[in-house]
Amino acid sequence: MANIGKITQIIGPVVDVGFEGEYALPQILDALEVTRPDGQKVILECQQHLGEDRVRTIAMDSTDGLTRGMEVKTYGMPISMPVGEDIRGRLYNVVGDAIDGIPSGVAANRMSIHRQAPKFEDLSTNTEVLFTGIKVIDLLEPYVKGGKIGLFGGAGVGKTVLIMELINNIAKAYAGLSVFAGVGERTREGNDLLREMIESNVIRYGDEFKHSMEKGEWDLSKVDATELLKSQATLVFGQMNEPPGARARVALAGLTVAEYFRDGDGQGQGRDILFFIDNIFRFTQAGSEVSALLGRMPSAVGYQPTLATEMGAMQERITSTKRGSITSVQAVYVPADDLTDPAPATTFAHLDATTVLNRKISELGIYPAVDPLDSTSRILSPEILGSEHYDCAQRVKEILQRYKELQDIIAILGMDELSEEDKQAVHRARRVQRFLSQPFHVAEQFTGLKGELVNIKDTIKGFNMIMDGALDHLPEAAFNLVGSIEQAIAKGEKLVADSKK
């Protein structure tokens, strides 16, 4: 039987609810429900017990239309997400309501979004490389299967494009399931992602729907329910226009779905899951927005004092167990390009590999704008990757570091003042830097270049050829936005031939 309380105060997304009699108080993190005058339900989450039989809650939806004195029901349980095979291909919000417009029945099973991290003895410790087909990542900061990967970058340097390309390369090439949590990012990007996934058959709406989509229609009556169950992805969204309560919880909602797929439903073996979060910074930002309203003293740069605790509680759940694995790729917005900001700095500690995107590299027209010297990986070692891969990666880093050191001298005195050896290092480093770029499948419509996936053996061969001086006769432009070294050679020879005409 639900207990009934009444709203006593509303301050933006924070709602105070009074109950009569101390036994009626909901527990911390329990869900409460209030109905707006238009019949829409708003879910609240209990955050604090204030004394005098009052609790302070955060709303998961807009509090417009709520007034003091409105009745609030308690559920006696936290916010939960629907689970089961029929959630494949579906689009949910933070409280587990389908928002894709496709009719659905009531979910038989639901799981609380607040759960304990797996016990230490249940964790898996295997180390396996996850190749992505992106040269700069596979060579210099290889990803770990079942590990945590962070994509760091300021505004507009290409985090979302890179995450979309990773979904394209890994989710398509790999038959497993993907879960995407859109946390406080642009609604347009969520729409683009859904369309991209339908076109590439990661989410299956059926041929009839795809034909109608090609004509510019969006007729959900044509969705094939049996095809939908064969989808390989589930999406959970709480976008920029949502209140902070939803943005602070949607990452946990997506993670709950990923955990369900990883562990199975108790009927046998779990699975290997890909879990994408775009953007983990918004999770922190939402927490800081409500922190002051909840009466907490702000800490460094105005963030909530519980920043490390909240981040740790979530990141510890993203892990691989003996039943299945979660490989997570998290985009991390870096405010004002400052990696020492508490939000990105707290995230760093939890990751196995970091891919740092640099605005200076994007200004050179090199995409993906990955900083090869700032990016790291726990598994960049000869024991795991083999000595050929490791030696090539170290040579690339060495030549780029030398180029970086010489840039000040070049800026002041010019190239002519360098020794012959340094001139040669600079020429090769510039070719290496350009060869780290590559055209993406998801950017074909913008670049006009066909997307490329590059095998790691071809990547190593290409960089070794450049550093050994075998391609010194080709112009630098030949190495920009190409896939394999053969394409660069063909492009270079064409440029040389054209210049002689």
Swiss-Prot record:
Keyword Ligase: no
One Gene Ontology CC term in the entry: proton-transporting ATP synthase complex
Reaction equations catalysed: ATP + H2O + 4 H(+)(in) = ADP + phosphate + 5 H(+)(out)
Membrane topology: Peripheral membrane protein
Record GO terms (molecular function): ATP binding; ATP hydrolysis activity; proton-transporting ATP synthase activity, rotational mechanism
Protein's UniProt keywords contain Cell membrane: yes
InterPro entries (UniProt xref): AAA+_ATPase, ATP-synt_VA_C, ATP_synth_F1_bsu, ATPase_a/bsu_AS, ATPase_alpha/beta_chains, ATPase_F1/V1/A1_a/bsu_N, ATPase_F1/V1/A1_a/bsu_N_sf, ATPase_F1/V1/A1_a/bsu_nucl-bd
PROSITE patterns: ATPASE_ALPHA_BETA (PS00152)
Localization (cell): Cell inner membrane
Domain of life: Bacteria
Keywords from the named record: ATP synthesis, ATP-binding, Cell inner membrane, Cell membrane, CF(1), Hydrogen ion transport, Ion transport, Membrane, Nucleotide-binding, Translocase, Transport
Binding site for ATP: 153-160
Family: Belongs to the ATPase alpha/beta chains family.
Function in brief: Produces ATP from ADP in the presence of a proton gradient across the membrane. The catalytic sites are hosted primarily by the beta subunits.
Subunit and partners: F-type ATPases have 2 components, CF(1) - the catalytic core - and CF(0) - the membrane proton channel. CF(1) has five subunits: alpha(3), beta(3), gamma(1), delta(1), epsilon(1). CF(0) has three main subunits: a(1), b(2) and c(9-12). The alpha and beta chains form an alternating ring which encloses part of the gamma chain. CF(1) is attached to CF(0) by a central stalk formed by the gamma and epsilon chains, while a peripheral stalk is formed by the delta and b chains.
NCBIfam families reported in the protein's UniProt record: atpD
Name of the protein described by the UniProt record: ATP synthase subunit beta
Gene from which the chain derives: atpD
